[in-house]
From Swiss-Prot:
Any one Gene Ontology molecular-function term assigned to this protein's record: ATP binding
Biological process (GO), any one: alanyl-tRNA aminoacylation
Cofactor(s) required, per the database record: Zn(2+)
Name recorded for this polypeptide: Alanine--tRNA ligase
Cofactor: binding comment: Binds 1 zinc ion per subunit.
GO cellular component: cytosol
Similarity comment: family membership: Belongs to the class-II aminoacyl-tRNA synthetase family.
Subcellular location: Cytoplasm
Function in brief: Catalyzes the attachment of alanine to tRNA(Ala) in a two-step reaction: alanine is first activated by ATP to form Ala-AMP and then transferred to the acceptor end of tRNA(Ala). Also edits incorrectly charged Ser-tRNA(Ala) and Gly-tRNA(Ala) via its editing domain.
Keywords for the protein's UniProt record, in alphabetical order: Aminoacyl-tRNA synthetase, ATP-binding, Cytoplasm, Ligase, Metal-binding, Nucleotide-binding, Protein biosynthesis, RNA-binding, tRNA-binding, Zinc
Domain of life according to the entry: Bacteria
Lineage, uppermost ranks: Bacteria, Bacillati, Bacillota, Bacilli, Bacillales
Amino acid sequence: MKSLTSAEIRQMFIDFFKEKSHSVEPSASLVPHEDPTLLWINSGVATLKKYFDGRVIPDNPRIVNAQKSIRTNDIENVGYTARHHTFFEMLGNFSIGDYFKKEAMEWAWEFLTDEKWINFDEALLSVTVHPEDDEAYDIWLNDIGIPKERIIRIEENFWDIGEGPSGPNTEIFYDRGESYGNDPQDPELYPGGENNRYLEVWNLVFSQFNHNPDDTYTPLPKKNIDTGMGLERLTSIIQQVPTNFETDLFMPIIRETERISKRKYGNSEAEDTSFKVIADHIRTVSFAIGDGAMPSNEGRGYVLRRLIRRAIRFAKDLGVNEPFMYQLVPVVGDIMKDFYPEVQKDAGYISNVIKVEEERFHETLNDGLIILASIIEEERKKGSEVFPGEEVFRLYDTYGFPKELTEEYVEQQGFTVNQAGYDKEMNKQRERARNARQKVDSMQVQDTIFTEINVDSTFVGYDQLQKETTIEALVKDKNQIEEANQGDVLYVFLKETPFYAESGGQVADNGWIYSENASAYVSDVQKSPNGDHIHQIEIKEGSFKINQPVHAVVERTFRNHVIKNHTATHLLHQALKDVLGSHVNQAGSLVRPERLRFDFSHFHGVTAEELQQIELKVNEKIWESLPVAIDSKKIDEAKAMGAMALFGEKYGDIVRVVQIGDYSIELCGGCHVINTAEIGLFKIVQETGIGAGTRRIEAVTSKQAYDYLNTKLDLLHNSAQKLKTSEEQLPERIEGLQVELKDSQKQVDSLSAKLSNLEASSILDEVKEISGVPVLAQEVNVKDMNQLRSMMDELKQKLSSGVILLAAENNGKVQLVAGVTKDMLEKNMHAGNIVKQAATVCGGGGGGRPDMAQAGGKDPSKIKEALQSVEQYIVDTVK
């Protein structure tokens, strides 16, 4: 067996199959862009379904790849076992209707045993086959020459991971030797059993069937080969280490974690688990974020958030109590740079995303862990080993603890979670969310009547704003009708329509429908389930009938403003990528005539300087008068051109490609200007965050941008007039006023302090003795809590011995301060307790040190009663 690095093993695998006339398929993004059945790309074959199910014919039926993959169905096992990972690489060779079992098996054996390649000792390899797969058994036995005692028939040898290709499989196992298991009584000590001695190296699937969405199986058009070999596991065998984590794919990460934590890997099993969790999870989140996923509270984002927070929790066991994972990203990039240079290239961006997420969780982590520990302690005192489900929900809802993280933590403490209690609280939250939703009269929820209507309707509004057409159907009160009259509000289907139906963020057109003796206002247009345009109308005059000729007219000014804003969003999208980075992707948009809104992925707020650069880039492209070309292309051709496809959007075989000069190219079904010069002007009015990793820009164009700037100029002009200066000198004038205000404030503070001292001196006469303790309890007139504390300091200096309680009313609220001199502390007087008792009387709360404390209250009418409370406190304390 050769001594090889993981990079050499990966390249050797690809080179071997290139010699066997295979084409190399590049590793696809971890985020599936064309497969809604998958959360992540989870295998080498996942990206090749289109070939296996016959939808697409590859140029070469022989394919080889090294595919990055994510599986998260058993996150809780990662770190505790030798080979569980959330991120891994799958080496695979594939045949689409070309070679089949014999070639696949012989080539696998050649790669593993030939001295030119891996050069395993043949005697250490065993294989498994499906009990009914006699063909595979015979090939192993007679063609390749494996002794029959090393060929095991196993019922589980049928590969099926849900929708997609499936079929019988054969697996190759490597014997690591007796040091990993030698008990002849162990029923699992055989290739394919649950043991650490015989490691599965390679899985060869003979794909003969397609697993359909309805769980039926149909024969594939041609027999195919789908193989998979985990790079991490193969590397552990070749590098002769006990687990995958000791390979060169993980050890540099572990070494860097050692440096950060000042702990050593290999010293304790518990700490080793933490090292493994961190090393695995940083690989996953680095690659996933690099491929466009972002931490959030749902879907893929929730998986990333859970992994980051799980790693942070385990890092605490290594003494790491601050953000650290972001420091590991360059290490991941360096390990993988030969085959995946993009991680190293985007390391800065990936690190920033992770750091922001770490900082966010650290803000609440300690509080959450303290609460976790206290709840466990309380339950133990009760003799319970069940962690309350409602507390699991509270930790998630308040402190951002993923449910799975809490479950894992409490299980380590010997507890189980009350799932029913958690479900009950989650259902309550869902009900609250449902009740909070605004109920609107919209066509977003389609009635069955719209599903039943299937007319021959065509949209012609890309280049026509009015059209002679025919009424195909009328719908009122969920029923088709023959005729509608003045005052009716209903829905109409047209044979041909110039009205754009709301989609892709662009709002629907409005306008009018006319006949010889009737008119109707079109207020909304939506798409029916069958793709036809449904026009919501109100008949202003006359009546309309089925099959009646009509004249449909889009409101031109409305549409003109909309298309300017829509084209501007395309320019903005590209400008964001130029300024902030290629990671920026559209997350939503709204295109209205008066404004545009654009949501995009980014890990922190956009600076004022960046916003200026973005705005300038968009305007420069407007002023360059770039032509806007719109063409229909095949989807593959459009993507080859570099057209941006929006994640989550579904596209047909033919798509509209909107190209703005040589600056922007996107797939888009909306309406646009002919030349960017028509937009005139672009102005950003606001940038905000709308969720973790998602930002929003709102902007105006054309006349609205002109009006917006004029409003700002008017404000500037009026402000200058009021301050009796010119617009150019306004900043200087404001600075001067700020200096004057600061000086005036100092004078006010000085006078207030003097008045406070005078008042302090005047109320010293109000001191009275309670149970031998001098007491001053008084309502005073001050402007804020700072002045109240200053008065307290003054009084404590002047009153050599005693207890003081001061109260003030400001803005309808009660402010309280208590003070105790040093000698009174020895008599157990406590300012914190005094002020807390007084605040309770006023409907508030507070506390503090024994010598000085403050509090607040809600009811000023109770001030007198609150001041009197100190007397009873002293009587009780002196006793």
